[in-house]
Amino acid sequence: GDLTLESELMVSEKAWRMGGSKMFVEVGKKAKVEDLIRGVIVQSGNDATIVLAEGLAGTEDAFAKLLNNKAKTIGMENSNFVNASGWPDENHYSTARDLSKLGRALITNFPEYYSYYAEEEFTYSDITQKNRNPLLYRDIGADGIKTGHTEAAGYGLIGSGVQDERRVVLVVNGLDSAKARAEESSRLLEWALKNFDNKTFFAANATVAQADVTMGKASTVSLVTQEDVMA
């Protein structure tokens, strides 16, 4: 259903019993959507992901179907999701390229919520937890996005940073420790921000070509950019 940041969702026993990292929601009580979002982003709360999934779609399975449909709309062609938390399952998978597309979509489509990813800590029920993203604690322009870890996949991270109005999204995965994840992601972000530049190929409202028109009033029509074309 439609939710707002102020909406309150009931915590099911399934969510409360969920293993792994937790936000520590309490079974039978309600939690605010904004708190749950922060619990997922900052605290890596597997329990919070299930509360949100059930609130949005009724069940976690139904949410996974919605998730797969949405993933396809943003070009994630080699991913399949069967749960909300990323809990290990042979049918739950993605690729570095797809995860980079997800990161870019988060930044582009939901700028009003992206600031949550830069929060270094969050307190819920008097329990304060630090953000696990190591990039946030290094002065290299990072402002997100999300860590991940399972025994099968190793330590991973979708990271992002901005410098001189130029944004970089990076993905690392399969690293053998949190320390290795921190070092490799930091190295990649610093390198990318120093060694790549944005180039403007066409300014907004520029005529870039003429297209032939068949049986029209004019023989050609101008192709004009709506916005700056950069890469």
Per-region residue spans from a language model:
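Active-site-adjacent loops and short helices of periplasmic peptidoglycan-processing enzymes
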Residues: 1-97, 104-108
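Domain-terminus/edge residues, biased toward the C-terminal soluble/receptor-binding domains
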Residues: 76-80, 88-93, 97-231
